[in-house]
């Protein structure tokens, strides 16, 4: 028996935005290949306007975020839920809860509700105290109104168990291995191999960009430091202004060409990953898959993925030490190799898609008492 599955909570596919869109793109297409009927809800503002994508049905719902800001996300999620209630899906998979769980009483009663519980959004320092309090409340509502839960990090799974006494299925993101084709696409005349440090992140305080660049700024390194990320927001403008006098630091803006990003990661001397909040971060997995040597912020989320196969830092002083002292020798090459092995066997998209299907079928069977053959 194959199921009728809906995926809500993202801006839509194909991915032009971020983590949940990224995984929804892979999982939806993968489930279709396994014979399921899958519908993904897209914002009406999404650049992709067709009604199907790689066999996935696309429903375009009105999204007023462009008119009224963040409040529009709540209206968009409401519109998606109202449509989903009419379509009698077997399973509704909600990616996140920040603007949907307030509508939990409207979740389709005839569908099995599974929520991917996101990464402790209320901890993000970019949010004001009232917003952080609301996000805690939204998390509580998501637990209350969902029947089953997915955690993309073992840290999140432990948190949900300790905080709410609920079990969740650990299913991480995936990544594709760095291909020979991608290597060939990289123009080596643009950047000298291993002659630069690299950071790629949204310009937000919790991504420790200031700490990383301060450490580099205080170093004696003769290498350059490339920063990939949109600097047009308030924090981005602050960062570019603060380090404008260091000619070694190059702000390259946002780059959504995956092959270019992966080539830059692969060729970097050391890739800095400063994310401190959230589950399994897709950009970290991409760096691992791209065979980058990684220095990561010292926190449970990053350590649960990288273990001992990375350098860690807590402050600018430790960043400076890494910049001035890390060598590319046998031990470092072994770290890169071990991370690549993790991508092949733990964070492989085929494994992730299979885990999603297994869990969805298991949840449906538990709810309906039916034996289902995948």
Give the ranges of each region predicted by the language model.
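N-terminal strand-loop element at the rim of the active site
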Residues: 2-3, 10-16, 30-68, 155-157, ...
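Conserved donor-binding/catalytic core segment of Leloir-type glycosyltransferases
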Residues: 6, 189-207, 213-220, 225-226
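Glycosyltransferase donor-sugar binding loop
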Residues: 46, 200, 223-237, 250-254
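An aromatic- and histidine-rich active-site surface loop
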Residues: 72-85, 89-117, 279
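Membrane-proximal helix-turn-helix segments that form the acceptor-binding/catalytic region
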Residues: 82, 131-149
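Short hydrophobic beta-strand element within catalytic cores of glycosyltransferases
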Residues: 270, 289-296
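Aromatic "clamp/platform" in nucleotide-sugar-dependent glycosyltransferases that forms part
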Residues: 275-276
């Amino acid at each position: 028996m194959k199921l009728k599955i809906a995926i809500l909570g993202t801006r839509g596919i194909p991915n032009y935005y971020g983590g949940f869109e990224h995984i929804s793109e892979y999982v939806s297409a993968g489930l279709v290949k396994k014979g399921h009927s899958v519908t993904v809800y897209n914002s009406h503002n999404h650049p992709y306007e067709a009604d199907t994508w790689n066999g996935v049905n696309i429903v375009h719902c009105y999204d007023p975020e462009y008119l009224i800001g963040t409040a529009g996300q709540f209206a968009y999620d409401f519109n998606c839920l109202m449509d989903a209630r009419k379509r009698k899906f077997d399973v509704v998979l909600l990616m996140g809860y920040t603007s949907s769980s307030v509508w939990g009483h409207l979740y389709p009663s005839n569908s099995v509700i599974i929520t991917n519980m996101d990464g402790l959004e209320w901890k993000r320092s970019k949010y004001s105290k009232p917003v952080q309090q609301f996000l805690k409340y939204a998390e509580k509502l998501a637990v209350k109104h969902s029947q089953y839960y997915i955690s993309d990090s073992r840290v999140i799974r432990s948190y949900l168990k300790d905080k709410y006494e609920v079990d969740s299925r650990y299913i991480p993101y995936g990544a594709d291995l760095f291909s020979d084709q991608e290597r060939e696409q990289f123009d080596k005349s643009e950047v000298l191999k291993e002659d630069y440090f690299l950071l790629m992140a949204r310009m937000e305080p919790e991504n420790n960009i200031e700490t990383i660049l301060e450490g580099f700024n205080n170093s004696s390194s003769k290498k350059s430091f490339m920063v990939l990320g949109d600097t047009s927001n308030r924090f981005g403008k602050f960062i570019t202004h603060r380090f404008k006098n260091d000619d070694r630091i190059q702000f390259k803006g946002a780059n959504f060409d995956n092959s270019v990003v992966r080539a830059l990661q692969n060729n970097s001397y050391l890739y800095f990953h400063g994310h401190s909040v959230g589950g399994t971060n897709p950009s970290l997995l991409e760096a691992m898959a791209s065979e980058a040597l990684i220095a990561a912020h010292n926190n449970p989320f990053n350590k649960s993925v990288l273990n001992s196969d990375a350098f860690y830092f807590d402050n600018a002083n430790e960043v400076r030490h890494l910049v001035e002292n890390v060598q590319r020798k046998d031990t470092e090459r072994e770290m890169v190799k071990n991370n690549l092995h993790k991508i092949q066997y733990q964070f492989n998209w085929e494994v992730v898609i299979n885990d999603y299907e297994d869990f969805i079928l298991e949840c449906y069977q538990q709810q309906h008492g039916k034996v289902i053959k995948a």
